[in-house]
Every structure is written in C-alpha cells, then in structure tokens.
Amino acid sequence: MTKITRTFIASAAACLLAILLMTVGCFAYDYSTITGTKASGAEISGYSGALEVNVVDFGADKKGKKDSSKAIQKALDYAIDNGSNSVQIKVVVPKGKYRIDRLLEIYSNTWLYLEDGATIVRNFDKGCMIKNAQANGAGGYGSERNIVIEGGCWDGNPSSTSRPFSNMRFGHMKNLWIKNVEIKNNYNGHHVEIGGVKGITIEDCDFHGYTGTSQKEAIQLDTISNSDVFPAYEPFDDTPCDNAVIKNNKFHDLIRGLGSHSACLGVYYTNTLISGNSFYNMSGTAIVLINHKKCIIENNTMKNVGCAIDFKYMTDYENANFHVPNSGYAGIKDRLDDNANTIIRNNDITVVGTYYYPEPYAIQIFGKKLEKSYSHPDYNYTVKGVKIVDNIIKTAGSAVRLTDVSGIFIGSNDISYDYDRYNYSMDLIWLSESSQVTVTKNKLTGTKQNSVYISGGSGNEVSSNTIKKPGVSGVYVSGGSDKNTISGNTITSAGSNGIKITKEAKADVRKNTVKKSKNHGLIFTGGSGKASDNILEENGLSGLMADNSASVEFFNNSCNKNKGYGIKANKKSQVKISGNSFADNSKGDIYVTGSAAVLLNAPDNVKSQDICSDKLTLTWDEVSQADGYYVYRKTDAEDAEFEQIAAVTDGTSFTDYGLVPKTRYVYKVKAFLDTVDKIQEGSDSADMSIKTKLTIVGCTTNMRGSMSYTGKERTQIFDVFVGGETLIPDVDYRTVYSDNVNVGTAKVTVIGMGQYCDSADFQFDITLKSDNVMVIKPQELNRKSIVSGKPTMKAQGYEVAEAVKDKLDHTTHSEPAIVVNYNSPSQVIAKARADMLDLRVRSYRELTGETIYGAWL
C-alpha cells in the first residue's frame, strides 16, 4: 500500500468517526446503561483458627481512672507475631470505661471487639484515637488488611484545648469492617477517616456528637494525595477508596453525615453503596460525594437536614476542593471521565433551612466548565449518567438542583413543598446549563417558585408529571435553552402561568393539561416553539399566549372556559395556528393586538377545473381556523403584480369570469382570520399558472345529413372547423353520440379538449334502408314511368307519389297512392302506369306502434 493510499484511508476513517460522533450526540441518553454499583464491601474470611486476648489481662483499667492505652496497645500488638491470613487475633474489651491518653495502632488480621457497655474515651488534645499501624509503609492498598472493629463506644471527648481530630483513621489498606459501633463526640474532624482503602463495610453504627464549625463528614472517604489532605500516611500516591458498603447506620446531631469533600483531579472513588441509613438533625449535608462513580444511594431516611445528597465533579471554588495529582497534569484529560453511573432511589428525605443551608435543597448534581482557570486545566467537568427515582422528598426550599450535567433521569419521585416550616422561595426541580435531562412521572406539589425550572442546555424532557399549586409556573424554560420537550403533564392551580417559555428558549409543548392557572395556561414570551394537542381550561387569562415571540405554532389545542381569550398574541409575536378548538372563553376565541400576527397555514392542493375561454374555477383544501380566503391574480407578464380579485367566505372554491381567451393567468390563495380588532392573513399558497382556452361553440362540420338504420350505433367520420382551422380529433376535441341506434334523429356532441373548451351539438337522420322492391325508370317519350320489382316480407305497404324531377328531396304535389297489400306489387305497378308520370316510392311498416318509412326511390 502506498503512503498516499494509507493517508487517504486514514483521513476517510477520521471523517467517518467524526460523523458518527456527531450523530451519536443527537440521540437521547441511554438510561439503561446506568446500573450503579455491585459493591460487596470488606471480604474477611478464610481463617482456619483464631486467638483471643483480653485487654484487662494486659492491665487495662475498665473503671477509666488510669490510662489504658498501653495495655490495649499490648493486646493489639499480639497480632504482630501471632496473626496471619489463616489466624485471626480477637482483642476483647470487656464492659467498662477505658481512658486512653494516646492513640492506638491496629494491625492486620485483628478483630477488635468491644463488649456491650464498653467505652473507650479519648483523653488527649491532638491526634486520633486509633489508626492502622502502617507496619510495612506500603502505598496503594498494600499496608494493613483484614481489620474488624466491632461493638462498644468510642468517645472523642473533646476539651476546650482540643485540636481538630478524627476518632479513627485508616489508609493504604484492604478490607476494613466496622460494625455495631457507637462513635461520638468529635471536634472539627471526622468520626472515621478513610483514605486509600479497598473493601470497606460500615454497618449498624451510630455516629453523633460534633463541635466546631468546619463542615466535616462523620465518615470521610478520601484519597491519599498529600499531607494537607491525609497527613501521616506516606507515600502520597493518590490512592482512592474503592468498594465501600455503608449500611444501616445512624447519623444525627452532626454537620455532615458521610462522603468526600475533596478529590484528586482525574482520580475517582468507585463502587459505593449507601443503603438503609438514617440521617437526622444535621445542619449541613447528609451525603456529599465529590468525584464518585458507580454508586447506589438507596433506602435511606434523611430528616431535618440542610441538604440530603450533594454529588459533584467540580465545585464553585475548585482550588479548595480539588488538588493536583502527584503525577501532574500531563495527560490529565485522558483520565477525566464524566460518566457517574449512579442511582439515587427509594430515599425518604426532609430538608429544612439551616445555618449552613439557609436555602436548602435535597439533591444536587453539579458540574462546572472551567475556562481560564488559574488552578486546574480548562475543561467541562460535567456529570453524566445519574438516576434519581422513587424518592419521597419534602423540602422547605428546592428538591433537585442540576448544574452543567447531562443524561440525568428524574422519575417517579413524590416531591412536596413544606409550608409548615420557615420556607424559601426556590424551584422544586432546577436545571442550569444541563442537557438530555428527563423529568418524568413525578408528583410535584407546591413551591413558592416553579415546579420545574430550566435555563440553558438543550434536549431536556419534562413529561407525564402531576404538578399542583406551584407559586409561579408548573414548567418554566428560559435562558436560551433549546430543543426541549414538555409533554403529557397535568398542571393545576399555578400561581402565574401553567407553562412558560421565555428568554429565547425553545420548546415543543404537547399533550399537556393545564387548568386554573392564575394567568395563562401556556405562554411564550420571548421564546419560540410549538404547542400542540394541549388542553387549556379555566385559566385566569388566556389559554395560549404569545408575547413578543417571533416564531410560535399553536396546533390542535383545546382552549375552553378561560377567563380571557382562547388564544392571544401581542407585541411582535408571529403565531401560526391550525386545528385549535374553542368553547366558552369569556372574551373570545382569538385576539391579536399591537404588531402581532396570527399566521394561518397556506392553502394546500390548489387546483383548477372547468377552464374555458372566459372563465375558470379554482379549488383548494380547507385551512383550519380560517374565516375565509383571499384570491389573487395576475398575468404572466414580467412586470405583472398580484391583485386581490375575491374574498371567499363560503367554501373553498372560486370561479373567475370575464377572462380573455388563450391568455395565461397566475393565481394564489391566502386564508384570513377575522380577529377582534383586525384581519389576520395566512401564508400564500403555491402559485397556480393557468391558460384560458378557445371556445368550440360555433364550429362547423362536414357531417352527412342522414344514415341508414342498421340496428347498431351509427357514427361518422367528419371534420370540425373553428375559425378556418381544422381541429385534430382526440387532441382538440372529442365526440359523444346519443340516440344513434334506432331510426330517428341522432345527436353528436363535439366537446373541446386541450386548448378548446365548451361543446357544440349536431344532428343527422337515421332512416330505414330501401327494400329495393321498386325500380322507377322514367321514360321521356311517352311521359310515363315504369315501376317494377319484387315484393318483400319486410314491407307492410308502399307509398307512391308524384315527384319533382331531378330533385333528391322530392316534394309531394298530390296525395300518394297507397297500396296496403305488399303481397300484390302488381297493383302498385298498374296504378303507377295509369295515373302518374314522374314517381317516387317508399316502403313502410308499423314498428312498436309507429309507422316507419324507408328511403324514397
């Protein structure tokens, strides 16, 4: 393969890939890919035996009067030489109160078990109560392993001179299990601080008691990145936590419950299950997760918290929460991954205003685009792929807030506004600069602002929600947000408008039911889009309103019992309407004011028929909402201009008379609507070019005057002449025969075709054919004629008459001699010879009660 060929193929492949990527970007987000986590937590098993030691045996004072830290540490040290992957060391702390004056260190394969009623009390001002020993100094997850802490109480017991501390700290290890433990009383730190641990289970524990103002989590999941983030745990290698199960715990009387308030850029916490926990009386956030992915947060109860769940891939103050990787920023964008793959479901949440959250919200998903950042690479740190489903949320502020995210699904939640508490003017569901977000099948009740607010972004869907009593609008779309769909929602008793599209936003609004809004059912004000198949009833002003909106379509909506108009347009609005229905609107069906315009559809299927020399008829399809139609005409001259020639208010056709033959005219039709103050015109139909014809009336023919009766249809070949021109059959005209079988007068109608119109009628006779029973031979010498022949069974008799010589059409000068007996032709002969000179003769017979004559001979 040549270099040129390889280059061409590579370029073509690159172009194809670009097209595919652009195409994929047009599709809706595939929510089926959001599966959450399969986290299993700590996996501690496989021991063949266990050794048990008791701290009292090492001199621990269970009355708490003496320092027991040395005794307890000796018991823990027993695991150094005696514990292994096959032998677990169980260190038992009996019921009692144990004072420790310095921190404790725990080693691999240790089960530290506190019996019911056992409490370890911290009695020093600096540092944690217990940490893993870091015996080998390894990084990653390679230090301690298989540590269990179970039962009892760990009391941080801060004093007035205490420095910030964590009750427990664990890092660079694998498999940590904390269960059925009460951990209480911390000052400006964490109850449990975990960094760089893989395999974590924390269950059935009780976390409470906190002093200080720092917003720190009771359980902190962290990366080991530097001495500021996780001091005393070298090496600093950015190891994150992975595979954590935190379930069935209690968190109360704290600022924050659990999570991560910092992260290393490009490093993610993965596989976290937070389930069945209860959080209550928390002035801050129950769960804060920065840079987490593959999470499930389910079946938790969160009561009286300032914020329930805060999920972020960037923060407002990025330099405070995100730090530089130890490997630096080289190749950092290859390590960034915005797919969160997280599920938040079946949680029961009540949020209230607090010191830290004066404007509370239940759930936040937050991303941020950095441009010209002084601390981190410029990048859109967005969040994708989160489901928020089946939650019960009661809020004194907002329920769900989304910033710079995409692929978020908010479905089947029961969200209500708490009017019984001090509350705040916020939107229930708030979207900012977010795209491909679906808000569906939620029950949204109350709020002082909007039930669903969208600003910026594109491709969002708000569908099949039940929305009641929003303070402002049920759905409010603003800030240039594009390609939004609002469908199938039921909105009642909005404090302002049911649905509002404004500030250059665009939306397709369809199949919604909006009732009893204080103002309009649906309003476009400075926005654009289409409203179709909506039901708008009993609203305080109009059902549909276009206010200074340049491009709006109202199709097939039902506007009933509104206190204003069915449809209203004002200022510079341009509104296309079709198929709308109206009933019992107090002020009327359609009202247009200012420089607004209601634009009807252009008439379709404009056709011409009955085209003739001086007239023609136009027909077209009916235009919905039209009160009538204007018809315009011009000639095809280059400088000709359309002139209105008719206003049709009855039907969809018009006949134009007084036209000039063989002249081309151009027509167009436009629907109009008679609103309250003025006539509104629709769009023009397509131009229809038509040429008038010549009339065939007055034409002549060379048709024969008679033809013989044969019992079959008689037709002729003849020419038709108009103005000296010979017409071409089946091009310029066609013929239609009638009465052209039986004896009598046949009719021929010549009908114009092509450039000819109208018709002309002609006639010819059909007569019985002569029987040739008589032959008349005039003889000039004796002025007599000889009549001879044979009788015929067809004739019943004969007429013989004197004829005017040399004339085809004879005139009878005397009564003819009638011979009734056709079997005796000799009588005819004799009579003729005796009485007549020049004769003519014809046969006759009775046929269906009428005398039918043959041709004269």
Regions found by a protein language model. Give the residues of each.
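Acidic Gly/Asp/Thr-rich repetitive segments characteristic of extracellular carbohydrate-active
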Residues: 55-92
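Extracellular fibronectin type III
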Residues: 674-692, 847-857
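Short glycine/acidic-rich loop motifs that flank beta-strands on beta-rich extracellular proteins
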Residues: 100-103, 122-127, 158-166, 187-194, ...
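N-terminal extracellular ligand-recognition/capping segment immediately after the signal peptide
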Residues: 84-128, 154, 183
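Conserved aromatic anchor
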Residues: 614-625, 786-795
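Beta-strand-rich modules
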Residues: 656-675, 834, 838-847
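Serine/threonine-rich, repeat-prone extracellular segments and beta-strand-based repeat modules
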Residues: 726-757
